[in-house]
Amino acid sequence: MELSESEMLDLWKTMMQLQPAHYGCAIERTDGIDIDELLLIHIRKWYASLLLSAPDGIVPVEDVKDRLSVMVADNGVVTAMVPPECVRPVEWKLKAWQKSVTLFLQPNVPEAAYLHNEWTRPGVCDPAAVDYGNRILLFTLPDGELPIFDMARCVVRPTNGKYVFHASVLESLRVNRSTSQRRDDPILRNLDNSSFRVFDDLI
């Protein structure tokens, strides 16, 4: 699915059962709360979380190998600066490697520290990578080889402002409209505490 922000807002309202039942009515808010803006904040947070944590098969993934800024240190460690639309790496491979990497270590774990030691640093048979957010460190490039990438697949945030995801994630938008669920949801609490004036358009 690929939806604009307005289409996503309409879908969100439908899934949360917030669309008016009677389309012949005009609704005017009297408490000054912009419900659409509240919902958009909720939507943007939901989508950001989806991009960070969902399986790569249901969120947009692109090969960004041609958009990387790459540097190679004397010890063969490759630093690749990722483009701003990249949310997280999925699978990367240097042409000199015998296999790709799909596990990207966080810099604060002990395994990442071992990679910086020349005696425990991996080679082309069992490469490794550390994710620093805006850059990826790749271990290691053999002497005499160029840092050419076969792939650098990343989950990306669409640059056109669209919401792109597999239709299967819509189940997560379904909201139980029981009293307890509405009490726990701040968006729905705002709706319940609001004042509406409904005017029949036939009058």
Spans of model-derived segments:
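Glycine-enriched, solvent-exposed interface loops adjoining structured elements
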Residues: 1-126, 130-203
